[in-house]
Curated annotation (Swiss-Prot):
Involved in base excision repair of DNA damaged by oxidation or by mutagenic agents. Acts as a DNA glycosylase that recognizes and removes damaged bases. Has a preference for oxidized purines, such as 7,8-dihydro-8-oxoguanine (8-oxoG). Has AP (apurinic/apyrimidinic) lyase activity and introduces nicks in the DNA strand. Cleaves the DNA backbone by beta-delta elimination to generate a single-strand break at the site of the removed base with both 3'- and 5'-phosphates. It holds the Pfam family zf-FPG_IleRS. InterPro entries: DNA_glyclase/AP_lyase_DNA-bd (IPR015886), DNA_glyclase_Znf_dom_DNA_BS (IPR015887), Formamido-pyr_DNA_Glyclase (IPR020629), FPG_cat (IPR012319), MutM-like_N-ter (IPR035937), Ribosomal_uS13-like_H2TH (IPR010979), Znf_DNA_glyclase/AP_lyase (IPR000214), Znf_FPG/IleRS (IPR010663). Binds 1 zinc ion per subunit. A zinc finger (FPG-type) spans 257-293. Its EC number is 3.2.2.23, 4.2.99.18. It comes from Bradyrhizobium diazoefficiens (strain JCM 10833 / BCRC 13528 / IAM 13628 / NBRC 14792 / USDA 110). This is Formamidopyrimidine-DNA glycosylase. Monomer. The lineage of its organism: Bacteria, Pseudomonadati, Pseudomonadota, Alphaproteobacteria, Hyphomicrobiales. Belongs to the FPG family. The gene is mutM. GO terms for molecular function: 8-oxo-7,8-dihydroguanine DNA N-glycosylase activity; class I DNA-(apurinic or apyrimidinic site) endonuclease activity; damaged DNA binding; DNA-(apurinic or apyrimidinic site) endonuclease activity; zinc ion binding. DNA binds at H104, R123, K166. PANTHER family: FORMAMIDOPYRIMIDINE-DNA GLYCOSYLASE. Keywords: DNA damage, DNA repair, DNA-binding, Glycosidase, Hydrolase, Lyase, Metal-binding, Multifunctional enzyme, Zinc, Zinc-finger.
């Protein structure tokens, strides 16, 4: 499933053709994706100007002039394709190869900018929903999400407060969207390695007895910022076929320190340890037992 950097790559690819443009035609070519489309889904989109395109955690959010917001999630296999008369690009296409097969083109937005934006989703785990902006706080899909890891409010003090007293593992805490929104398995593994913290470490150790952030918390927040920013600059990670707006692959997987490197030598200078993998909360965890404590 695409994580925050991949979704941000998609947002940046769609922004030039969506922001400020009108949705001239909206089509839902089947009754559902992961969830059924709302009965008025098309009617609430057609003719609306997109005033802004943002992101919350792993969700894309298109602000409409009507006061509604189009909430979009890529799911496991969803991708957007931008079709122009003189160009065909895939902004942040993730997981499935881009081809000419339109069988799984389930949603179309024809924009006044001259672009057709097509949502393709073979496995149909993605979803779209139109929500009134003043009702966003009550939306079940968004309610309870923690701070954005790249936002100004996310710092060591906030992370320490969120983890204070938690007996769960550090990795499980970071994957909890209530603690921090948008992190997934890949970037949690990478951030823990770069901060030299064990994924098995108890989350509560990020806070002192007085609730202040420890050095561990400060290192971890710095590593999260670095990993996410580096991944966004690289266009995300191409585990199968993640593409940028130019159609090029994302390249951050070439910078992985631990993820999917089981049995290989740790890249930490002077470490010399071997990357191990174990199952943690149903997911593969990659780490270096020698330098992550």
């Amino acid at each position: 499933m695409p994580e925050l950097p991949e979704v941000e790559t998609v947002r940046r690819g769609l922004q030039p053709v969506m922001e400020g443009a009108k949705i001239v035609v909206a089509e839902a070519r089947r009754p559902d994706l992961r969830f059924p489309f709302q009965p008025d889904f098309v009617a609430r989109l057609q003719g609306q100007v997109v005033t802004g395109l943002g992101r919350r955690a792993k969700y894309l959010m298109a602000d409409l002039a009507s006061g509604d917001v189009l909430l979009m999630h890529l799911g496991m296999s969803g991708s957007f394709r931008v079709i122009k008369p003189d160009n065909d690009a895939a902004p942040g296409e993730f997981h499935y190869p881009r081809g000419k097969d339109t069988t799984h083109d389930h949603v179309l937005f024809r924009m006044s900018s001259g672009a057709d934006i097509v949502f393709n989703d073979p496995r149909r785990f993605g979803y779209m929903k139109v929500i009134a902006r003043n009702a966003l706080e009550d939306e079940p899909l968004l309610r309870g999400l923690g701070p954005e890891p790249l936002g100004n409010e996310f710092d060591a003090a906030m992370l320490a407060r969120s983890c204070e007293g938690k007996a769960t593992s550090l990795k499980a805490a970071l994957l909890d969207q209530r603690v921090v929104a948008g992190l997934g398995n890949i970037y949690v593994c990478e951030a823990l390695h770069r901060s030299h913290l064990s994924p098995r470490r108890i989350a509560a150790t990020l806070a002192t007895r007085k609730g202040e952030p420890t050095d561990h918390a400060k290192r971890l927040v710095g590593a999260i910022h670095t990993v996410l920013n580096d991944a966004i600059k690289a266009g995300g990670s191409s585990l199968r076929d993640h593409r940028q707006t130019t159609g090029e692959l994302g390249y951050f997987q070439h910078s992985f320190k631990v993820y999917d490197r089981e049995g290989e030598t740790c890249k930490t200078p002077a470490c010399g340890g071997t990357i191990k993998r174990f199952t943690q909360n149903g997911r593969s965890t990659f780490w270096c037992p020698k330098c992550q404590k």
